[in-house]
């Protein structure tokens, strides 16, 4: 099988490439160039797309004796990921750019190009598995499971993917990399937003969106202070509110709602963050069971709590509603709601699909 391995320059994709070679596949490594800024480095950040990362990926491919290429997806990334990130915050949402990158670039765009060039599959270093029926499962390594950030791809895309390291504990991956003599064996994991290398999201959004003054109010509508832009805030935020007027009982305040149209940011108690009803659109399907009415579990952030719920999915309307069996806090518009079926066997939970949260109660 002709396999294209997406090489981030980290230890996970390094070992994924090695395992693909060991399995006897015809393998090439590809690093995705997502930025035009050639000066962006990893020196002060833990992103995944720097010049240093590209050089690390090349060294691994050289050691494995496989071809290495850099494919430029910077224009697609700018529009589909960075543009979406800015637009979502401007709408008062809380997007996850890594999910959008997986959805639009690392799978959709990469697969299109790979298939056009005659490749049979794309392999990545993600922690998830695909069962014998072709459905995605959680990794059994719960601490590293990445099925949530993969829940936004389609079944058609999944059919051309595989995850060589999906169920292997991370310490074992690092040991395997050491045995291969890979320079990435001890390389730290990436977690920063790659297009905000200094980690200052508010400054980035301020430059991108500009000042849009509005008011912070309490749940009774009382005005507490003016702000420079609703994009400064996310649902569940407690730090950085800088509200001088204390609550009657001295309890902390949290952001409970953002109305981007009026610029109004509402703050309330921790109890005000609890939701038991979620609505989502922009649905993605990974399993035929994601249709009609059914019981399942939902996760709304990477490594977040998993809550049982009853789902109603209307494929024709591209809409789903979730009635939660127990409250979830800090659920924001723009986040992904990924649905799971509890595992019926020794493998991880089954990933049904996902939707983008557009409303809560």
Swiss-Prot record:
EC nos: 2.8.1.13
UniProt-listed GO biological process terms: tRNA wobble position uridine thiolation
Gene3D superfamilies reported for this sequence: Adenine nucleotide alpha hydrolases-like domains, HUPs, Translation factors
Active site positions, chain numbering: 101 (nucleophile), 194 (cysteine persulfide intermediate)
Gene Ontology, cellular component aspect: cytoplasm
Record field: catalytic activity: S-sulfanyl-L-cysteinyl-[protein] + uridine(34) in tRNA + AH2 + ATP = 2-thiouridine(34) in tRNA + L-cysteinyl-[protein] + A + AMP + diphosphate + H(+)
InterPro entries noted in UniProt: MnmA-like, MnmA-like_C, MnmA-like_central, MnmA-like_central_sf, Rossmann-like_a/b/a_fold
Predominant subcellular localization, coarse grouping: cytoplasm
Site entry (Interaction with tRNA), positions: 126, 335
Record key words, sorted: ATP-binding, Cytoplasm, Disulfide bond, Nucleotide-binding, RNA-binding, Transferase, tRNA processing, tRNA-binding
tRNA-binding keyword on record: yes
Top-rank taxon: Bacteria
Disulfide feature: 101-194
Interaction with tRNA, as annotated region: 144-146
Subcellular location: Cytoplasm
GO MF: ATP binding; tRNA binding; tRNA-uridine 2-sulfurtransferase activity
Chain residues that bind ATP: 6-13, 32, 125
Function field: Catalyzes the 2-thiolation of uridine at the wobble position (U34) of tRNA, leading to the formation of s(2)U34.
Family according to the record: Belongs to the MnmA/TRMU family.
Listed name of the protein: tRNA-specific 2-thiouridylase MnmA
Gene assigned in the entry: mnmA
């Amino acid at each position: 099988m002709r396999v294209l391995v997406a090489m981030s320059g980290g230890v996970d994709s390094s070992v994924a490439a090695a395992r693909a070679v060991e399995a006897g596949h015809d393998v090439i490594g590809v690093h995705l160039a997502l930025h035009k800024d050639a000066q962006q480095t990893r020196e002060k950040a833990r992103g995944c797309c720097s010049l240093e990362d590209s050089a690390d990926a090349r060294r691994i491919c050289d050691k494995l004796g496989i071809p290495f290429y850099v494919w430029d997806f910077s224009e697609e990334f700018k529009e589909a990921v960075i543009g979406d990130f800015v637009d979502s915050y401007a709408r008062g949402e809380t997007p996850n750019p890594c999910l959008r990158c997986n959805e639009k670039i690392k799978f959709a765009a990469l697969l299109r190009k790979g298939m056009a060039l005659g490749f049979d599959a794309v392999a990545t270093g993600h922690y998830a598995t695909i069962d014998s029926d072709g459905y995605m499962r959680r990794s059994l390594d719960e601490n590293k499971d990445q099925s949530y950030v993969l829940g936004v791809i389609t079944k058609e895309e999944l059919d051309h993917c595989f995850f060589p390291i999906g169920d292997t504990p991370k310490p074992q991956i690092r040991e395997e990399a050491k045995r291969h003599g890979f320079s990435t064996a001890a390389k730290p994991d990436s977690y920063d937003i790659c297009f905000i290398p200094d980690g200052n999201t508010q400054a980035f959004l301020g430059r991108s969106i500009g000042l849009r003054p509005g008011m912070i109010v309490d749940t009774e509508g009382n005005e507490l202070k003016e702000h420079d832009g609703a994009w400064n805030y996310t649902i569940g935020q407690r730090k950085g509110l800088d509200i001088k007027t204390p609550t009657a009982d001295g309890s902390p305040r949290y952001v409970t709602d953002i109305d981007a149209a009026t610029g109004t940011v509402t703050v309330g108690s921790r109890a005000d963050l609890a939701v038991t009803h979620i609505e989502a659109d922009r649905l993605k399907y990974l399993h035929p069971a994601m249709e009609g009415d059914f019981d399942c579990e939902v996760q709304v952030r990477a490594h977040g709590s998993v809550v049982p719920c009853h789902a109603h999915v209307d494929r024709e309307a591209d809409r789903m509603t979730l009635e939660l069996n127990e409250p979830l806090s800090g659920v924001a518009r723009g986040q992904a709601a990924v649905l799971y079926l509890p595992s019926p066997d020794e493998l991880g939970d089954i990933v049904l699909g996902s939707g983008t949260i557009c409303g809560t109660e």
